[in-house]
A protein has these predicted regions:
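Active-site donor-binding loop signature of nucleotide-sugar glycosyltransferases
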Residues: 14-17, 121, 150
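Residue-level preference for short coil/turn positions at secondary-structure junctions
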Residues: 89, 112, 141-142
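Conserved active-site loop/cleft motifs that coordinate metal ions or position small ligands
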Residues: 93-96, 118-119, 148-149
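Solvent-exposed beta-strand/loop surfaces of large extracellular or lumenal domains
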Residues: 117-135
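Loop/helix patches that line or flank the sugar-binding groove of alpha-linked glycan CAZymes
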Residues: 1-104
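C-terminal beta-strand-rich structural cap/linker in extracellular carbohydrate-active enzymes
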Residues: 130-151
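Beta-strand-rich binding/interaction modules
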Residues: 102-122
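Short, surface-exposed beta-strand/loop "edge" segments at domain boundaries and coil↔beta transitions
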Residues: 90-91, 124-127, 146
Length: 151
């Protein structure tokens, strides 16, 4: 069986009602934060974890490179993860920052003069490399993720 903190394994809170969508009594005590942390509240909040995952799943569905593309690690900095996913049709750059502060990093070995189109980013503007450059400097938000399509 599973061991650890049983308080972390409480029934899913579908609504702010302790019984959720059921008339039955839950088999375990519900979470203490049920009034604010439930599926109904998450559906209303565009910044919720629900919408974050929905966005990522939609990206994966619409960009096959995320699921079947070749994986190429890019060496950047400590507490960051950077890699490309590529198919014959598409190349994506994925950047993750595990730092609690924003972090500037240099991404190298990109196609000469490439343009990075934001698919998931805090900046909606494309980033362009110099016409003769294969490198770009990007500042990642604290504990953030950015996904770009490389053109």
């Amino acid at each position: 069986g599973l061991y650890g903190d049983p308080a972390l394994r409480v029934p899913m809170s579908w609504t702010e009602n302790a019984k959720g969508f059921s008339e039955n009594t839950p088999f375990r005590e519900v979470a203490r934060n049920i009034a604010t942390h439930n599926v109904a509240a998450a559906l209303k909040d565009p910044n919720s974890l629900y919408h974050f995952y929905a966005t990522l799943l939609n990206l994966r569905k619409n960009h096959p490179a995320l699921s079947i593309g070749r994986y190429t690690e890019i060496k950047t900095a400590e507490n960051t993860l950077s890699f490309q996913r590529q198919t014959d049709e598409e190349s994506l750059l994925i950047l993750l920052n595990y730092n609690k502060e924003s972090h500037a990093l240099s991404v190298e070995n990109l196609p000469v003069g490439a343009t990075l189109l934001p698919l998931y980013s805090n900046d909606s503007q494309p980033l362009s490399l110099e016409k003769t450059s294969t490198q770009i400097n990007i500042t990642l938000p604290a504990q953030g993720i950015q996904i770009y399509q490389i053109k």
